[in-house]
Amino acid sequence: MTGAGPGLTPELAVGYLQELSADIRAAVVLTPGGEPVAGPPELAAAASRLLAAAPEAAEIEVAVAAGAVHAARGERHAVVAVCGRYALPALIRYDLKVVLGELAADPDGGEPAERTEAA
């Protein structure tokens, strides 16, 4: 698998995850504190609650009949992915770790650039 490349932003990370696996239905990137950075807003609140429920866990997997939710944390970001029922957990966890590594390598920290008003 080829890495996402340097300068992966949280917005690009969400799309990259969905390209990596057809089983990933949606993904969200959050700060370590659970604040949403990128991804669908309707997923961000639930993802934040999931991470808050297991504050010491580096990885989380919740499976139900319809699919699974996988989460992974790094020092600078957390990533949560909603997957279909046939997703392979080990591969999804690997993909999440790859994305976390690429986000950590971003010199800007994955934060949106400051916007300046045009004069």
List the predicted regions and their residue ranges:
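Non-catalytic interaction/Regulatory regions outside core domains
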Residues: 1-119
